Amino acid sequence: LSMLLGMLLRPSVMPQGESRQQESAGWPAWRSLVAQSWRFLACVCLLQGAHAAYYGFSAIYWQGAGYSASAVGYLWSLGVVAEVIIFALSNRLFRRFGARELLLLSAICGVARWGIMGWTTELPWLIVAQILHCGTFTVCHLAAMRYISARKGSDVIRLQAVYSAVAMGGSIAIMTVFAGFLYQHLGHGVFWVMALVALPAVLLRPRVAAH
């Protein structure tokens, strides 16, 4: 919902008209696109997939630490508010940032956020962790939209589809299964693992910055 609100405030990827003759459909076009963008896709899959433990088990973990259901709801709401604010101010805040720089910022926020959640359940730190949702999720999504919008022609639509299916869907689904196994055996240690999952994104960022 918060991502939808942010996108309504300002669409990140504007549609571009082109003739049917320019479109190249078929498997070769998709294969070429993935070959050119695999670093980007791997990076965003790690950053978005690292949210799996948070989405699936943070409420259970916090309630087990003594927080009421309403307190957990407020913490989740704080993350949503931070997300919407950054979406609304993104043009002003990140005007000079390319996709590569935004992905670095998101990765740093990811390591910090999941590390905090694995380290403590003290309320002040959980508030910080929830505010960092604007970095782990929103900044990553903004970087993806900036990278995708720099593509040419029908590649924009194709890469948007791959990003939505793989990074926003598949990676989170797979990591949720993995996180469930880890939470059963490691408890809060699953968040440390998520911090480690986000870390390689620093090196996997696409080499060419897309503005």
Locations of regions flagged by a protein language model:
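Juxtamembrane intracellular "pre-TM" segments in multi-pass secondary transporters
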Residues: 10-46
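Intracellular juxtamembrane helix-capping segments at the cytosolic ends
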Residues: 138-152
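Helix-to-loop junctions at the C-terminal end of transmembrane segments
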Residues: 85-99, 183
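A membrane-interface helix-boundary motif in multi-pass transporters
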Residues: 1, 178-198
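Helix-loop boundary and gating motifs at the non-cytosolic
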Residues: 36-75, 141
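Structural signature of the two symmetry-related core transmembrane helices
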Residues: 101-116
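A late C-terminal transmembrane helix in Major Facilitator Superfamily
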Residues: 157-185
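C-terminal membrane-cytosol helix-exit motif in multi-pass small-molecule transporters
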Residues: 1-17, 201-209
